Amino acid sequence: MISANFLINQLSKYGFNFFTGVPCSHLTSVINGVINSKKIKYIGATSEGEAVGIASGAWLAGKKSVVMIQNSGLGNTINPLTSLNHTFKIPILLITTWRGDPKIKDEPQHELMGKITRNILRLTKIKNEIFPIKENNLKKVLLKINNS
């Protein structure tokens, strides 16, 4: 398992210096880590779509942005991602937890969204990678997304 500190340090190495998102129990340690960081700015959002807007504004102001959300809120990001980010080529990194992953037993309310999450990303032309478990694989994924 990748620690929150390792993730934050790796993202910082690639220049990610602005984080936003909505609370998610699976991301608590990462959210707390960026809140407590002296190098990274964090602004909490009231909705996933708002987080995309905040991150996009930060990019326009010269920041490299990360949005942290649960996949159950992915639907709330579709309009800003397709109308704002796609149209104006505004890059942001989405860290999206995958509740309802068909390979992992989860709560019933996450079942449908878990099944369709990857399809939503594909249909909206959002490049995506499954979050790696090993630190070395995280470095490879970050190198890949940083060069795309």
Each language-model region and where it sits:
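Thiamine diphosphate
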Residues: 1-148
